[in-house]
């Protein structure tokens, strides 16, 4: 099987972008976990909502940033020559 170098590099570029996009899964799992635990905490102690919500929002932001970085890397691999 003969593959020219351009086709091989293009295939590796797509493979790398796909693997980088897998990092978005971690962000989704993290956001779901953080939100679920915050809802449980507020359900148990409704008076703690004012303390739980800011912490939850910080956790959501950190989880989302990792997904955005993974998406950025995947897009860079696809469209930058």
UniProtKB/Swiss-Prot annotation:
Membrane topology: Multi-pass membrane protein
Subcellular location: Cell membrane
GO cellular component, one term: proton-transporting two-sector ATPase complex, proton-transporting domain
Signal peptide start-end: none
Keywords for the protein's UniProt record, in alphabetical order: ATP synthesis, Cell membrane, CF(0), Hydrogen ion transport, Ion transport, Lipid-binding, Membrane, Transmembrane, Transmembrane helix, Transport
Reversibly protonated during proton transport, annotated site positions: 64
A Pfam family matched in the record: ATP-synt_C
Record carries keyword Ion transport: yes
GO MF entries: lipid binding; proton-transporting ATP synthase activity, rotational mechanism
The UniProt record lists the keyword Cell membrane: yes
Transmembrane domains' residue ranges: 14-34, 60-80
Protein's job: F(1)F(0) ATP synthase produces ATP from ADP in the presence of a proton or sodium gradient. F-type ATPases consist of two structural domains, F(1) containing the extramembraneous catalytic core and F(0) containing the membrane proton channel, linked together by a central stalk and a peripheral stalk. During catalysis, ATP synthesis in the catalytic domain of F(1) is coupled via a rotary mechanism of the central stalk subunits to proton translocation. Key component of the F(0) channel; it plays a direct role in translocation across the membrane. A homomeric c-ring of between 10-14 subunits forms the central stalk rotor element with the F(1) delta and epsilon subunits.
Subunit and partners: F-type ATPases have 2 components, F(1) - the catalytic core - and F(0) - the membrane proton channel. F(1) has five subunits: alpha(3), beta(3), gamma(1), delta(1), epsilon(1). F(0) has three main subunits: a(1), b(2) and c(10-14). The alpha and beta chains form an alternating ring which encloses part of the gamma chain. F(1) is attached to F(0) by a central stalk formed by the gamma and epsilon chains, while a peripheral stalk is formed by the delta and b chains.
Family, as annotated: Belongs to the ATPase C chain family.
Protein name: ATP synthase subunit c
Organism, scientific name: Clostridium acetobutylicum (strain ATCC 824 / DSM 792 / JCM 1419 / IAM 19013 / LMG 5710 / NBRC 13948 / NRRL B-527 / VKM B-1787 / 2291 / W)
